[in-house]
Amino acid sequence: LAEKVKAGLKIVGTPTSEATDKLARSLGIRIVAPDELERIDLTIDGADEFDPDLNLIKGGGAALLREKIIAEASDRMVVIADAAKEVKSLGKFPLPIEINAFGSELTRRRIHHHLVDLGLGNAPSSWRMATGESLLHTDGGHLILDLACGLIPDPVALGAVLDTIPGVVEHGLFIGYAEQVIVGEAGGARLVGKR
């Protein structure tokens, strides 16, 4: 993208993490804060997993709240991922859940209570750690709980339940956002889109 910008492509970007913001600026890409934009034409992002319906698990980079804010505000979302991220059912990759630090263990217990109600059992979960022994804090100051729930038979239902739990800031289920996935493979790229 930076090469295309140097060659004359006119774009304005709004990154979803401080690290991406810094990188984009260093490469000469014009960056603005999201609130400065009237609309966002296109979100291009990665995914930790995607299923045949283009439902996604995102948040491996701990920017899921900001990523979902931008995806929701965008006219279109295109995902770029390698073939290993394509799954029949979501859940192989642990589901990131962004949680407010206040009452975080209470929130964690509520999540597990609801998992049992959804038939997902007592899935193991762990707090995402930063380098060393400290808990990772997102750019927004929240914690990330990685939930290893295994296959998720109904991502819509799980997302709806997580949305009701006080303390859950956001979750990494991106349902209905992606319009197309560009899958990188050894022989080139393959396009996966809603039929």
Which role fits each region the language model picked out?
Residues 1-5:
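Glycine-rich N-terminal segment of FAD-binding domains in flavoprotein oxidoreductases
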Residues 13-19:
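Catalytic nucleophile loop
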